[in-house]
Curated annotation (Swiss-Prot):
It is found in: Endoplasmic reticulum membrane. This is Translocation protein SEC62. Residues 372-389 have a biased composition (Acidic residues). The chain crosses the membrane at residues 197-217, 235-255. It is a multi-pass membrane protein. Keywords: Endoplasmic reticulum, Membrane, Phosphoprotein, Protein transport, Translocation, Transmembrane, Transmembrane helix, Transport. The modification Phosphoserine is found at residues 341, 353, 356. The modification Phosphothreonine is found at residues 158, 375. The keyword Transport applies. Residues 325-335 have a biased composition (Gly residues). GO terms for cellular component: endoplasmic reticulum membrane; rough endoplasmic reticulum.
Length: 399
């Protein structure tokens, strides 16, 4: 009895909240980020004090109107106002308490760990026997492993392990004061949102209209009848599609011996939106034996090796042809150099012939040099004959 009297006295001292306080509390309730958890066996919503202060500083009450001062100017003013709301029981302060594991749970986990360790040892012994059998196949798989590594680099990385969040529960705090920080406050004020009010009103009107269906005009009743028939046909078509896609999958699976998995409209029965349930149109997966894949890869590698060998043979033939042409050029150049090493003009011709051989005009320059060599040789023979003719004349004159 004494506690009830004290509670009534507190309510009388605090008084009822004003319209402004209700408006601020309603704005804070629907705009401040909240989270839900369990407290004393009930589901409650809670918020953090610092986020509530930031929310009110961004509200319309933090801006000054004409002839009036702003309600919230600093963080301290917001804290004082929130203390008023706390006293009027819009929310109350709570304390976070981390959930501790009981001894029974710890024992169960230990027993599970022992059982799992025994299973792991059995698995390890089996794996060792399997590894001995697979040593022969490792050499063949090295080449395939390099290809798989290249594919893995292209694919996105493996998803990281989810961090386990620590579980906690809320308990009422002894000191009911609003403090700016990471303190937790649980909502008591729970007004009806405008959207929920509108949705409920529409639902009530729809129920009343459905009960008055016999009083509707004939045209409206016929229209509703056709709409209901169309909706029923649409639902029936979706059900038929779901059955047909399963039948198609089974037919293809049986014909191909389980190698080809073809799904028409794979997301039709998935938990997605209406439009996404029709995307993609189909999916196809090949789940055949690995031997076929290895044969295909070996055939591809052989084809690549053959093509590489053919290219190498073609390149070697070209180099041999160039090598045959090269020595002939050098030989002709050597003869020309020995015959005409004394004259500057012959040296210039040799340089030109070397430059032309680099440009790929070897055969043309060879013919020109041969002609020039022949003409030079004829000129030298004529000069030698003239010199021989002059020597006897000079001997006669001396005599």
């Amino acid at each position: 009895m004494a506690e009830r009297r004290r509670h009534k006295k507190r309510i009388q001292e605090v008084g009822e909240p004003s319209k402004e306080e209700k408006a601020v509390a309603k704005y804070l309730r629907f705009n401040c980020p909240t989270k839900s958890t369990n407290m004393m066996g009930h589901r409650v919503d809670y918020f953090i004090a610092s986020k509530a202060v930031d929310c009110l500083l961004d509200s319309k009450w933090a801006k000054a109107k004409k002839g009036e001062e702003a309600l919230f100017t600093t963080r301290e003013s917001v804290v004082d106002y929130c203390n008023r709301l706390l006293k009027k029981q819009f929310f109350h302060r709570a304390l976070k308490v981390m959930k501790m594991k009981y001894d029974k749970d710890i024992k169960k986990e230990k027993d599970k760990g022992k059982a799992e360790s025994g299973k792991e040892e059995d698995k390890k012994s089996k794996k060792e026997n399997i590894k001995d059998e697979k040593t022969k196949k490792e050499k063949e798989k090295k080449k395939d492993g390099e290809k798989e590594d290249s594919k893995k680099e292209e694919t996105p990385g493996t998803p990281k392990k989810k961090e386990t969040k620590k579980k906690f529960k809320l308990e009422p705090h002894d000191d009911q004061v609003f403090l700016d920080g990471n303190e937790v406050y649980v909502w008591i004020y729970d007004p009806v949102h405008f959207k929920t009010f509108v949705m409920g009103l529409i639902l009530v009107i729809a129920v009343i209209a459905a009960t008055l269906f016999p009083l509707w005009p004939a045209e409206m009743r016929v229209g509703v009848y056709y709409l209901s028939v169309g909706a029923g046909c649409f639902v029936a078509s979706i059900l038929l599609l779901a059955v047909a896609r399963c039948i198609l999958f089974l037919i293809i699976w049986l014909i191909t011996g389980g190698r080809h998995h073809f799904w028409f409209l794979p997301n039709l029965t998935a938990d997605v939106g209406f439009i996404d349930s029709f995307r993609p149109l189909y999916t196809h997966e090949y789940k055949g034996p690995k031997a076929d894949l290895k044969k295909d890869e070996k055939s591809e590698t052989k084809k690549q090796q053959k093509s590489d060998s053919e290219e190498k043979s073609d390149s070697e033939k070209k180099e041999d042809e160039e090598g045959k042409v090269g020595p002939g050029n050098h030989g002709t150049e050597g003869l020309g150099g020995e015959r005409h090493s004394d004259t500057d003009s012959d040296r210039r011709e040799d340089d030109r012939s070397q430059h032309s051989s680099g440009n790929g005009n070897d055969f043309e320059m060879i013919t020109k040099e041969e002609l020039e060599q022949q003409t030079d040789g004829d000129c030298e023979e004529e000069e030698e004959e003239e010199n021989d003719g002059e020597t006897p004349k000079s001997s006669h004159e001396k005599s």
